[in-house]
Amino acid sequence: MSPQIDAVILAGGMARRMGGNDKGLVELNDQPMIKHAIDRIKPQVKQILINANRNQNRYAEFGYPVLSDEDSGYLGPLAGMITAMGQTQADYLLVVPCDCPLLPTDLVQRMLAAITAEDAEMAVASDGKREQPVVLLMKPALRGSMKAFLDAGERKIDFWYAKHHCVVCDFSDQPNAFVNVNTPEQKQQLSEAIAH
């Protein structure tokens, strides 16, 4: 029997480099950024959760549960992951950011295969040059470990997953899959790339 997999799309940040605009709701080619991520992920998972700390009503319009961080204060992606891990009953939780509109359509399949092959606790995606710390497939049972890490004042996801049996899943055959949008300039470049 294949494992049940849920996903959380992280849209809980402050988006300082986007002038404070809520990145998930910024339009890219006539669609909110998060809609691109939803469309890529939806066929790959059982349920989608959205982690958002503002504009929750707008995010709820996409038809998925919207979760705010358990700990207020914009503690970063780890806080959103911890919240989602506490809400899922799935065997695995896929984590993706809201500002990656070109996510692989075989993301779950390949990450799950990598975990199975290595008997690992989680997988992190790589574009062939660097790991993508907010593109993870992991067991929700790791929530306690992640919460202890965050409670100790730590914030860097890669430091946390380095403490666990984490396999790197290579997507160098799709080098643009994890291109994300942090600035208006990047948004323009990506918009042009998608249009062609």
UniProtKB/Swiss-Prot annotation:
The UniProt record gives the binding positions of GTP as L10, A11, G12, K23, N51, D69, D99
Q: What GO CC annotations are associated with the protein? A: cytoplasm
Keywords from UniProt, A to Z, are: Cytoplasm, GTP-binding, Magnesium, Metal-binding, Molybdenum cofactor biosynthesis, Nucleotide-binding, Transferase
Q: Which residues bind Mg(2+)?
A: D99
**What does it do?**
Transfers a GMP moiety from GTP to Mo-molybdopterin (Mo-MPT) cofactor (Moco or molybdenum cofactor) to form Mo-molybdopterin guanine dinucleotide (Mo-MGD) cofactor.
- Identify which cofactors the protein needs according to its UniProt entry: Mg(2+)
Work out whether the entry's keyword set contains Transmembrane helix. no
Q: What is this protein called?
A: Molybdenum cofactor guanylyltransferase
Does this UniProt record's set of keywords contain DNA-binding? no
Q: Which comment does the entry carry about domains?
A: The N-terminal domain determines nucleotide recognition and specific binding, while the C-terminal domain determines the specific binding to the target protein.
Name the SUPFAM superfamilies on file.
Nucleotide-diphospho-sugar transferases (SSF53448)
What Gene Ontology molecular function terms does this protein carry?
A: GTP binding; metal ion binding; molybdenum cofactor guanylyltransferase activity
Q: Which domain of life is it from?
A: Bacteria
Subunit structure, as described in the record: Monomer.
Question: Could you tell me which CDD domains the record lists for this protein?
Answer: MobA (cd02503)
Subcellular location field: Cytoplasm
Tell me its family. Belongs to the MobA family.
Catalyses: Mo-molybdopterin + GTP + H(+) = Mo-molybdopterin guanine dinucleotide + diphosphate
What is the organism field in this record? Answer: Shewanella loihica (strain ATCC BAA-1088 / PV-4)
One Pfam family assigned to this protein is NTP_transf_3
Q: What is its EC number?
A: 2.7.7.77
Please name every pair of cysteines joined by a disulfide bond in this record: none
Into which EC class is this enzyme placed? transferase
One GO biological-process annotation of the entry reads:
bis(molybdopterin guanine dinucleotide)molybdenum biosynthetic process
